[in-house]
């Protein structure tokens, strides 16, 4: 297993030199954030990014994400131009030595929360999702804006985009995803690029929009769209684990051990607080609803060799910055995972 860390570029208050100091840290997960969605990532920009990361003794392990343009998700006639651009970006990333791309197919919005600074009993703050609060919100009125969302369309554009999705149900979205996969995977195969779709977060429909990468059956349906070892998933325990329907160990055993299609792992804990509601918490098993020992053991049992990262953390010790992506709690999560891996591996030898 290759430990990696999410980094949001030179404007990220979490610096590469700090990330390098985390025990066992090998790689960086990042992207180029100033290129408009749907445009080609120039090779020279990718090489600049890689050089910056390598100058700190780290590896550019995973690109997360190359965003998928909404015209592709909507299945509009213009989608082929954007898919062509996406394919060229895959080629450029492969030429630069990148071998894994994490992406998602969530309509309009990326990961969604109702509060970015919910105060826990210990005084730390975290991200939470309260279904009742979300139901009262209207994102078209600017009532909710989160890191990672593409807001380039503006308020008027967002209303129009939401209107376009009124005729898109789950099966139409599946059809549009399949079209995209059939196009990009032919090239990904040739350049040996592992394409790892991220589950929808949260794994249910929001604001009347369909979401389809949500559970075991849908992940299996996705994997079966294209027969290639490079067509796979990012298994995010936080996204999938916020509903009791999803069994993380079962998913790791099937999609990892049996199918070998887990190309990237996001490791974080969540505490389920109600139907379709949850808090993000420390990685420790007792802090949330997931058994982190069993999750990490499932990866170790089949010798998962791919990249993983400690995912969202709380804000602790007075740290400020990008919600969910501070240094301190994610570093604690990394060290906790280090300890689990070492103990599990040594126990296997005895």
Curated annotation (Swiss-Prot):
Biochemical pathway: Carbohydrate metabolism; pentose and glucuronate interconversion
GO molecular function, one term: ferrous iron binding
Source taxon at top rank: Bacteria
Reaction(s) this enzyme catalyzes, per UniProt: D-mannonate = 2-dehydro-3-deoxy-D-gluconate + H2O
Reported cofactor(s): Fe(2+); Mn(2+)
Top-level EC class as recorded in UniProt: lyase
Keywords: Iron, Lyase, Manganese
EC number(s) recorded for this UniProt protein: 4.2.1.8
Tagged with keyword Lyase: yes
Record bears the keyword Thylakoid: no
Gene Ontology BP terms: D-glucuronate catabolic process
Pfam families per the UniProt record, alphabetical: UxuA (PF03786)
Family matches, as InterPro entries: Man_deHydtase, Xyl_isomerase-like_sf
Function field: Catalyzes the dehydration of D-mannonate.
NCBIfam families named in the record: PRK03906.1, uxuA
The family this protein is said to belong to: Belongs to the mannonate dehydratase family.
UniProt-recorded name of the protein: Mannonate dehydratase
């Amino acid at each position: 297993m290759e430990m990696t860390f999410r980094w949001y570029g030179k404007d990220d208050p979490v610096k590469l030199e700090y990330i390098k100091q985390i025990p066992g840290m090998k790689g960086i997960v990042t992207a180029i954030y100033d290129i408009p969605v749907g445009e080609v990532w120039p090779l020279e920009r990718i090489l600049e990014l890689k050089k910056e990361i390598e100058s700190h003794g780290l590896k550019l392990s995973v690109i997360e994400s190359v965003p998928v343009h909404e015209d592709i998700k909507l299945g509009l006639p213009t989608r082929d131009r954007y898919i062509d651009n996406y394919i060229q970006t895959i080629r450029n990333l492969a030429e630069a030595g990148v071998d894994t791309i994490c992406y998602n197919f969530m309509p309009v919005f990326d990961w969604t929360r109702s509060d970015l600074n919910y105060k826990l009993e210990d005084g730390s703050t975290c991200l939470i999702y309260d279904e009742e609060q979300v139901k009262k919100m209207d994102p078209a009125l600017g009532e909710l804006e989160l890191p990672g969302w593409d807001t380039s369309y503006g308020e008027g554009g967002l209303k129009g985009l939401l209107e376009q999705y009124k005729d898109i149900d789950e099966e139409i979205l599946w059809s549009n995803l399949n079209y995209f996969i059939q196009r990009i995977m032919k090239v990904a195969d040739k350049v040996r690029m592992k394409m790892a779709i991220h589950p929808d977060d949260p794994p249910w429909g929001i604001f009347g929009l369909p979401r389809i990468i949500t559970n075991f059956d849908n992940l299996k349906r996705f994997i079966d769209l294209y027969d290639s070892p490079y067509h796979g998933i990012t298994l995010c325990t936080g996204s999938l684990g916020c509903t009791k329907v999803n069994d993380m160990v079962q998913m790791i055993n099937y999609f990892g051990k049996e199918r070998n299609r887990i190309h990237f792992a996001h490791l974080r804990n969540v505490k389920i607080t109600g139907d379709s509601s949850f808090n993000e918490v420390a990685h420790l098993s007792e802090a949330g609803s997931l058994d982190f020992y069993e999750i990490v053991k499932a990866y170790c049992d089949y010798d998962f060799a791919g990249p993983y990262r400690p995912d969202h953390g709380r804000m602790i010790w007075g740290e400020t910055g990008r919600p969910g992506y501070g240094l301190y709690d994610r570093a604690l999560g990394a060290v906790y995972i280090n300890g689990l891996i070492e103990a599990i591996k040594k126990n296997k030898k005895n």
